[in-house]
Amino acid sequence: MARAVGIDLGTTNSVVAVLEGGDPVVVANSEGSRTTPSVVAFARNGEVLVGQPAKNQAVTNVDRTIRSVKRHMGGDWSIEIDDKKYTAPEISARVLMKLKRDAEAYLGEDIADAVITVPAYFNDAQRQATKDAGQIAGLNVLRIVNEPTAAALAYGLDKGEKEQTILVFDLGGGTFDVSLLEIGEGVVEVRATSGDNHLGGDDWDDRVVEWLVDKFKGTSGIDLTKDKMAMQRLREAAEKAKIELSSSQSTSINLPYITVDADKNPLFLDEQLTRAEFQRITQDLLDRTRKPFQSVIADTGISVSDIDHVVLVGGSTRMPAVTELVKELTGGKEPNKGVNPDEVVAVGAALQAGVLKGEVKDVLLLDVTPLSLGIETKGGVMTKLIERNTTIPTKRSETFTTADDNQPSVQIQVYQGEREIAAHNKLLGSFELTGIPPAPRGVPQIEVTFDIDANGIVHVTAKDKGTGKENTIRIQEGSGLSKDEIDRMIKDAEAHAAEDHKRREEADVRNQAETLVYQTEKFVKEQREAEGGSKVPEDTLNKVDAAVAEAKSALAGTDIAAIKSAMEKLGEESQALGQAIYEATQADAAAAGAPGGQPGGAEPGADDVVDAEVVDDDQESK
């Protein structure tokens, strides 16, 4: 029997896990990491980079690097690169293909089946788009499972026979969910779920970026938001600072050569961010997690004291302020520390894959639909057929009638949401039931049936009880992809798989070389165009030019050894260039501080004292 994997397709990072001898194992990727950045980049030579290699080159390839695409799933978002349009499911499929390859390399066999997780609060269109991404990646998606449910499954299977109530607080890179589950005797039942599909760690990063932009503008007068490359560097620095502040009270954010001033002099960003300041600028984001928590407690009608365990999911829950808020909301209950928040969802997905494949016995997973489903009736009212937090799979029917005399057809508009007015909810799709015999209004009987499968995907049927005529819609328009488009994308992905594998081997070296060439050329150009002439001798610049030309020549070919050699030489020349810039800057500063032409350094000054200390340190270290 072919193996099945569990995949946590995340906004920021993704994880793949598999069952080995009945136990879930998180698979390390080809770079040796257990998490893979959900980043896809299109290099200018046509190569597609996924994961860490894509993230590494983002600074020099901003417009062709896509991250956090999960936030666009189910919408009409697309990006055009080299005259080709890519949809969100297509980009997500690239991440899934890498996870599939890495798992196949680990297992030594092909993988066809997968369970993929989604945020509990994902609507029908977003779920369908995720399933489409799996198909494009060459995977048979056995089941779409809610992330908190997968986490509870991973957490709860070894907790014995006693029934327990578990609260899962899931704050990821781009989405937030709270779910309340009951676990006991091999049954995992979701009682209620709530959340926010546009709240996650990315938003905390954005606040730090805004803070840095304001600080830099205040000191230099330059607005970095107009510089795409600078903004990419700020984003990476913000994420790093956020992570560091989870374990320390302050962090330094130091970005050399972030931009240049009007005189082409390089400028540096150097700021100190404390945990207190970080929490101050992100407090409103934290407060947005309160309402979904309260909603889940209200929907289930339980008391906070009835919660037995609190499980934190998602890397963003490592922030101390988040942990403290969860403790406050749960009446001082200490969150469970026995699970890895980055991996627990993929582990649960692998277990569910095992259940569906028959490898894991005596486990029943009862999930719920996160939002109410219904149709628009007279007056634009939303008439709900399936209430939110109903256990799935489920099927509900209700009989409606016509609003006008001799009405020959009815338009069925399917909505998802909690608002009383249909138009304020999410329109999932619409279809028409025709051929209704002429009759006074209120006489025809139209039975509308909603059927939600275990993936949370909706099928709606309308049937005229008088004639037996019926029409059915499977809600899939939300993904924006037809079956033909999905088939085309699958073939396209398969055709490029071998080519991608060949290119991947040289990707890291090539990215590093391209980055070095770009940065070096930029600074050489700035020096030559500087007012008052370059601060660096022309022969130094010429040597750098020659090294750049050699590196470009190597990059034009496919010899990795030649690229490495040229990169090392360019690195040496770049260091010489940097040293010359610093020496010239120091000489200018010394001349400015020594009026009357006195030789700088004729008297021992503060600089000499620092030099002496450095020498002493070196001697002591020897």
UniProtKB/Swiss-Prot annotation:
Keywords assigned: ATP-binding, Chaperone, Nucleotide-binding, Phosphoprotein, Stress response
Induction, per UniProt: By stress conditions e.g. heat shock.
Domain of life: Bacteria
Pfam families tied to this protein: HSP70 (PF00012)
Disordered: annotated span: 589-609
Ranges of biased composition (kind: Gly residues): 594-603
Signal peptide: none
Residues with the Phosphothreonine modification: T175
GO molecular function terms noted in the UniProt entry: ATP binding; ATP-dependent protein folding chaperone; unfolded protein binding
tRNA processing is among the record's keywords: no
CDD domains for this protein: ASKHA_NBD_HSP70_DnaK-like
Family note: Belongs to the heat shock protein 70 family.
Functional summary from the UniProt entry: Acts as a chaperone.
UniProt name for this protein: Chaperone protein DnaK
